[in-house]
Amino acid sequence: MANRIMLNETSYHGAGAIKEIANEAKARAFKKAFVCSDPDLIKFGVTSKVTDVLDEAGLAYEIYSDIKANPTIQNVQHGVEAFKASKADYIIAIGGGSSMDTSKAIGIIIANPEFEDVRSLEGVAPTKKPCVPIIAVPTTAGTAAEVTINYVITDVERKRKFVCVDPHDMPVIAVIDPEMMSSMPKGLTASTGMDALTHAIEGYTTKAAWEMTDMFHLKAIEIISRSLRLSLIHISEPTRQAE
């Protein structure tokens, strides 16, 4: 049986990585960003760390903030309409899983309008085209939505959630910058850190594991075990936050 691993086209890791967003946008001839970020991140100045980079580079953008903790069909529909109105040609997703999931759904529907019924994306939808290019900038360490092909949408009307799996929704660029996570409270740092550790353990123990995934998961377990508790004790220490 063949093993498959899917990765972003490009990823940046480390302090100051968000500065590369402008370089990538220019290199790819992107014209205008559709910035997806939740209201709290905007309120507390986290989103502005990225938009400041865009401003300094003279790059156009529009912010979409109708993001819920568990993104709904309506959030996605509103986002699709807002994206069309913005005349943007790429998405910058800033936040945790909610912003990432909303961005993926918006990007898929824009590129594959025959799936405008959000429910039609449930499961493994037979989309034909890659979604609108997404630059994913996580602000937590737990979901890893910036490097996965999955997203979850809430159907409020039917009181259920559904999972969508689509290789076409993989962000083209992931930007993992510890400065985007430095303002997380201790409780959220602990819970998302444990979430990341759980993913690493599950990835190592799953029957689908193989040599390359073992390499990633064992190293992740080592780093998280070494640094999570220390990052809570020394919350402002950049080295621990970076790990």
Which residues fall in each region the model found?
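An N-terminal, well-structured beta->alpha segment
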Residues: M1-Y64
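Conserved active-site and cofactor/substrate-binding residues in soluble primary-metabolism enzymes
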Residues: G16, E20, G45, K49, ...
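Generic secondary-structure signature for well-ordered alpha-helical cores
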Residues: K26, D55-A60, E81-A85, I108-N112, ...
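Conserved beta-strand elements of the Class I
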Residues: F34-V35, Y90-I92, I135
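N-terminal small/polar loop signature for handling phosphorylated ligands or for N-terminal nucleophile
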Residues: I42-F115, L230-L232
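A glycine/threonine-rich phosphate-anchoring loop and its flanking beta-alpha core
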Residues: N112-E211
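Single conserved hydrophobic/aromatic residue that forms the stacking wall/gate
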Residues: I233-E243
